[in-house]
Amino acid sequence: MLSPEALTTAVDAAQQAIALADTLDVLARVKTEHLGDRSPLALARQALAVLPKEQRAEAGKRVNAARNAAQRSYDERLATLRAERDAAVLVAEGIDVTLPSTRVPAGARHPIIMLAEHVADTFIAMGWELAEGPEVETEQFNFDALNFPADHPARGEQDTFYIAPEDSRQLLRTHTSPVQIRTLLARELPVYIISIGRTFRTDELDATHTPIFHQVEGLAVDRGLSMAHLRGTLDAFARAEFGPSARTRIRPHFFPFTEPSAEVDVWFANKIGGAAWVEWGGCGMVHPNVLRATGIDPDLYSGFAFGMGLERTLQFRNGIPDMRDMVEGDVRFSLPFGVGA
């Protein structure tokens, strides 16, 4: 088996069988027969062990050359058959571009975007304006101008994403409240604005929290505004989002940027048949220090503000048990909410 004639015969047989293989399955069987562990070429390699040491090197070169020749033939035939298979698939799955087009299914709009647009439409209809601000903020706008003390827990890295280097005093905004400051510095009074956007906090993603969430925040600054105006605005907002039977109530609370401050609860009949009071967000009269930080005399003007999370609003309004469904991008979650294929 180690003679040049025997090796040539084995290679010729392998190459002939390889050339005749007309499918990948047939070629696989040919490989097993002529290049596998029990093939003539494999047996020739095993026979090297019994040769005298002085003959083994030369014989080994002949065996390797023979196997390499057969392997090259196999590789070339494999590439050819794969190319033929792929070409056949392209022909079978080809599209005649001259045919009339078919309807392309529309994607599903994300329910958070739909809710944000509905909130915006609600306040625009009330005569309010939309305002925007950057997602990368400074401590000045995110904390200082909003009356946060220097030692407030919200400033800690366990709650806030800070941006390197440390002395840049930049961070990912933790709420949309910085838009209030930017708006009051840039616009003439009175101001009635609504701000909707992404905010960032170092929360773990779980059934009720997400590190990136959307917040809607309202701000009104004018002469003579009171808690009564705030309550009326909240009631109108609640009815727009939860139906005409929705009601709100407020409970005393503390926020650095409002005084007095309150938390807002909403009562409504949800989409799964229940009705209850649910904590919705925060609100209050704009703190005099916030007005002073933007050059407004708190003896002449007053204001109110409120903020709610859109994910939380959508979750309890629609009976969604797990907030993670909102961020996983599964179209099956979005389709039931409206526009989609």
UniProtKB/Swiss-Prot annotation:
Biological process per Gene Ontology, one example term: phenylalanyl-tRNA aminoacylation
Cellular compartment(s): Cytoplasm
Catalysed conversion reaction: tRNA(Phe) + L-phenylalanine + ATP = L-phenylalanyl-tRNA(Phe) + AMP + diphosphate + H(+)
Record bears the keyword Aminoacyl-tRNA synthetase: yes
InterPro entries in the record: aa-tRNA-synth_II (IPR006195), aa-tRNA-synth_II/BPL/LPL (IPR045864), Phe-tRNA-synth_IIc_asu (IPR004529), Phe-tRNA_ligase_II_N (IPR004188), Phe_tRNA_ligase_alpha1_bac (IPR022911), Phenylalanyl-tRNA_Synthase (IPR002319), tRNA-bd_arm (IPR010978)
Cofactor detail note: Binds 2 magnesium ions per tetramer.
Binding-site residues, Mg(2+): 259
The entry's keywords: Aminoacyl-tRNA synthetase, ATP-binding, Cytoplasm, Ligase, Magnesium, Metal-binding, Nucleotide-binding, Protein biosynthesis
GO function terms (MF aspect): ATP binding; magnesium ion binding; phenylalanine-tRNA ligase activity; tRNA binding
Enzyme class: ligase
Entry cofactors: Mg(2+)
Domain of life: Bacteria
GO CC annotations, alphabetized: cytoplasm; plasma membrane
EC number assigned by the record: 6.1.1.20
Any matching Pfam family: Phe_tRNA-synt_N
Listed NCBIfam families: pheS
Protein family according to the UniProt entry: Belongs to the class-II aminoacyl-tRNA synthetase family. Phe-tRNA synthetase alpha subunit type 1 subfamily.
Quaternary structure and interacting proteins, as annotated: Tetramer of two alpha and two beta subunits.
Classification via HAMAP family: Phe_tRNA_synth_alpha1
Protein name: Phenylalanine--tRNA ligase alpha subunit
Source organism per UniProt: Mycobacterium tuberculosis (strain ATCC 25618 / H37Rv)
Gene that encodes it: pheS
